[in-house]
Every structure is written in C-alpha cells, then in structure tokens.
Amino acid sequence: MRFQCEIVTAPVSVRPVSRLSHDELRRRTLRRQFPSISGTGPEAVLELFQRLGPIQSQVPRAPFLTISSRLPGVRYQTVCELFESYQLVKTSNIRGTVHTSALEQFGWLDAVARTTRANQLRK
C-alpha cells in the first residue's frame, strides 16, 4: 500500500518574525509541555495527548507519570480505562521505541513511520 500526499496551498498573510528572548522561549516551551486543561476525566486526558502528541513509554509507568504531572488529581483507574478501551495505545511506531498516543493519532503516526522505516530499509 502506498500513501500519497497532496500539497494544497492557500494564500496566507505573512507576519514579521520577531526574535524571542531566551526567557520567552523557555516560557513558551514550558507552556506547551504543561498546557492548561481543566478537568481530570477521560476527556481531559485525551485532550492532553492531543496537545502533547505521543510520549515515550519504554518505562511502563511513564504515561501515568506524564499525565499526573500535567493533570493533578487524575485517577489511576481513569488512565487504565483509557488503555483498556483502546482510546490510549502503546505502540512502537516512532523510531522503533515505545510511545503512548491517543488512538486518533495512531493512524497517521503509523503511516508516516511505516513509510520512513521502509525507505530506511531500502538503503
């Protein structure tokens, strides 16, 4: 199966790029890693993964620690239920290492990673 991408261009307005200070870059990086999400239920956990993207999970407790550090008060059982219902999945689709991602992300992650791995193996 081959995947084809079609690039669609649309007119865009270009804003002048401003140079960030090191402090502002640090603040923005931390803000991205610790998004402001309200709630501790399944929807909040899935939103967290939508914003963060896949997280490395070679260590079994890594997704639990990542979630609890960003959504204080989330229950262990909530995360387990998301894994049991396959809304969160652990796979090795990125660089051959184990990552946890939301099920919605898995399809495109796997397609991109599979194509990349196939190209690497052909070399």
Region locations from a protein language model:
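Phosphate-backbone binding and catalysis cores of DNA-processing enzymes
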Residues: 3-123
